[in-house]
Curated annotation (Swiss-Prot):
Assembly and oligomerization: There are 1-2 copies of this protein in each type 2A encapsulin shell.
Subcellular location: Encapsulin nanocompartment
Any GO MF annotation of the entry: cysteine desulfurase activity
Phylogenetic classification of the source organism: Bacteria, Bacillati, Actinomycetota, Actinomycetes, Mycobacteriales
Originating species: Mycobacterium leprae (strain TN)
Cofactor(s) the protein needs: pyridoxal 5'-phosphate
Modification N6-(pyridoxal phosphate)lysine, positions: K428
Listed name of the protein: Probable cysteine desulfurase 1
Family: Belongs to the class-V pyridoxal-phosphate-dependent aminotransferase family. Csd subfamily.
Originating gene: cyd
Function: Cargo protein of a type 2A encapsulin nanocompartment involved in sulfur metabolism. Cysteine desulfurases mobilize the sulfur from L-cysteine to yield L-alanine, an essential step in sulfur metabolism for biosynthesis of a variety of sulfur-containing biomolecules.
E.C. code: 2.8.1.7
Superkingdom of the source species: Bacteria
GO biological process: cysteine metabolic process
Main location: other
Length: 611
């Protein structure tokens, strides 16, 4: 790519204003960072996984404007959650811990000078799910990526010998005990052999037993066995998730957090246990940092309007990448039009790699937020999440990582990642639709105002003013999606039991198997060939519209996505309006890929009716 082709689109206020092209500074011309301590060095001596961004020091031309928002309110941090049979005592409220808040605080009711009359406990009960989850939660640590011994791809998946495939890493996590569910994938796992180098090997799940946990995979479409290659759009649900939802409605259905009756306590237990499961799954420090939302889109909008609406001023900058889903573009465009902030876009190369040097060139003293995907939904590109966070913090910005496509494929630890916000959707990781998670550092969430008002998120309401709870309840106004939050918790426990590293290894092997075979078909152009990818294999076929190819595959029982995948900017960057996008999950097989490849080859040769 010529240097003149590298650019960043700068979006200024106004829906009718066209994007302006802002030249990216040449490499080496960014502010001098040689005297700036790294994020790791700055964090020495502290256990805070979310240190506040530190503005660049030692550079004369860096200006970080003083905050224009009022100081954070000292709000209670956790909503009361009462165990079964206990009625909340409304006559003797415990005193608020910490510093009191003055009468000027806008969150306080008239005439109230401090929070002591409205305090809530600093922690709730230890959640349980009555009669269902008797055992302790899985606590096996997630091994670092690329830290495990390797296995030959021929075993245990019976992959045909292919000269162009390398060995792949398989790092199955240990299966913790204590869970009474009878998971099919744990039955009759094969004995693991040893390689000649005497690396210690670990057990690998039986793919057919895994598939037995997903009832929809027994479906037929057009008389053919269903092959579900549309996993980047949504994943299928294991029977334990379906059963957990049914159990909730049959035995626990109630509103939560308030009431003296048994079912309310059961529902609260289940809901808060799901929050704790989500916390553990992504490595957050506290359950208060987990906010349930409808999905990734709502999570990003929450950050845009609650955090961005408070902190962004005219001329401030938000930096995203060219890889983003529309859900990580449109909210920032709307916010920019309302606040006068400027939206900048980091470019990608022709393979779909994010150009990190050009990304850093966009950062500066006016950068207030970086919002970037960890895995591209359209191309499968895996970005350098930790590097993005480090650079954003170096320039004093908050960082949001879109984990919608990374959460089902990669080990996630937000404490190690260091992002201020991390968002994902439940339906992308074998959970129900309509539920997702916003993770935010506790200090950041505490100083953010609510973005919706209603019940459940308040401590006290008068006709003049309202006093809000702390996170997470402050951001969960009204009756939430209780049942699907419980279902998400069950889905995450299921993935923990399978093993995130097992899943990553198997999916990478599927991608390595499918990629050269698809590329070998005459007329196929692979779209997105980044150095590091997750299990997305977008392509176009010469002489055939993507929708036609999708319909022809459907006739053979194969479900793929055909279109722009809510990522029009990056497809247009590559000269396309649409692609065919097969995407793999850990329940897919090599045999399914063989069927898919044969059908695409027949389409290319004109042997399949695509009308």
């Amino acid at each position: 790519m010529r240097a003149t082709q590298l650019y960043a689109a700068s979006f200024r206020p106004g829906f009718d204003s066209p994007p302006q092209l802002v030249p990216v500074a040449l490499r080496g011309s960014a502010p001098d960072t040689t005297t700036v301590a790294s994020a790791g060095e700055l964090a020495v001596g502290t256990t805070d996984p979310c240190p506040a961004p530190v503005a660049q020091i030692g550079v004369a031309d860096v200006y970080v404007p003083a905050p224009t928002s009022p100081e954070p309110e000292g709000l209670p941090q956790v909503a009361p959650v009462f165990s079964r049979g206990n009625v909340p005592d409304t006559t003797a409220v415990p005193a608020a811990a910490g510093t009191t808040v003055g009468v000027a605080d806008p969150y306080l009711p008239p005439g109230v000078g401090h929070l002591s009359g409205f305090a809530v406990p600093s922690h709730g009960i230890v959640p349980t799910v009555p009669g269902v989850l008797a055992g302790g939660p899985p606590t096996a640590p997630v091994a670092p990526r690329n830290s495990a011994p390797v296995l030959r791809p021929e075993w245990p998946y019976h992959v045909p010998s292919v000269s162009d495939l390398d060995w792949f890493d398989a790092v199955p996590a240990g299966v913790p005990g204590g869970d009474e569910h009878n998971y099919n994938f744990l039955i009759a796992a094969p004995q693991v052999p040893r390689l000649a180098d005497e690396h210690e090997m670990v057990d690998v799940f039986d793919i057919q037993a895994v598939r037995a946990d997903f009832p929809i995979l027994q479906e037929t479409v057009n008389g053919k066995p269903l092959i579900w290659f549309d996993n980047a759009a949504t994943t299928q649900k294991p029977q334990v998730v379906i059963d957990r939802l049914s159990y909730f409605y049959a035995h626990e259905n109630s509103n939560i957090h308030r009431a003296a009756h048994e079912l309310a306590a059961r529902a609260t237990d289940a809901y808060e246990e799901a929050r704790e499961t989500a916390r553990r799954f992504i490595g957050a420090a506290k359950a208060q940092e987990i906010i349930f939302v409808r999905g990734t889109t709502e999570a990003i909008n929450l950050v845009a309007y609650a955090w961005g609406g408070k902190h962004l001023q005219p001329g401030d900058e938000v930096v995203i990448t060219h890889l983003e889903h529309h859900a990580n573009i449109v909210p920032w465009q709307l916010l920019s039009s309302q606040t006068g902030a400027i939206l900048k876009v980091a470019p990608v190369d022709d393979a779909g790699n994010l150009l990190m040097s050009e990304f850093e060139d966009l950062l500066g003293p006016r950068t207030k937020l970086v919002a970037a995907t960890q895995v591209s939904n359209a191309l499968g590109t895996v970005t350098q999440g930790e590097k993005i966070v480090e650079l954003g913090h170096r320039y004093g910005a908050r960082v949001l990582i879109d984990g919608a496509q990374s959460i089902p494929h990669l080990p996630i630890n937000v404490s190690e990642l260091g992002a201020d916000f991390f968002v994902f959707s439940g339906h992308k990781i074998y959970g129900p639709t309509g539920i997702g998670v916003l993770y935010g550092c506790e200090d950041v969430l505490t100083e953010m105002p609510p973005w919706q008002g209603g019940g459940n998120m308040i401590v006290d309401v008068t006709l003049e003013r309202s006093l809000y709870q702390g996170p997470p309840n402050k951001f969960e106004a009204g009756t939430g999606n209780i049942a699907d939050a419980v279902g998400l918790g069950e889905a995450l426990r299921y993935v923990e039991r399978v093993g995130v590293q097992r899943i990553a290894s198997h999916e990478q092997a599927l991608l390595d198997y499918a990629t050269p075979r698809l590329a070998d078909i005459p007329g196929v152009r692979l779209v997105g060939t980044a150095t590091e990818k997750a299990s997305v294999l977008s392509f176009v076929l010469a002489g055939h519209e993507p929708l036609e190819v999708g319909k022809a595959l459907n006739a053979e029982g194969i479900a793929v996505r055909a279109g722009h995948h809510c990522a029009q900017p990056v497809l247009r960057r590559l000269g396309l309006e649409a692609t065919v996008r097969p995407s793999f999950a850990f329940y897919n097989t090599y045999e399914e890929i063989d069927v898919f490849i044969n059908v695409v080859r027949r389409i290319a040769e004109g042997g399949t009716n695509i009308g």
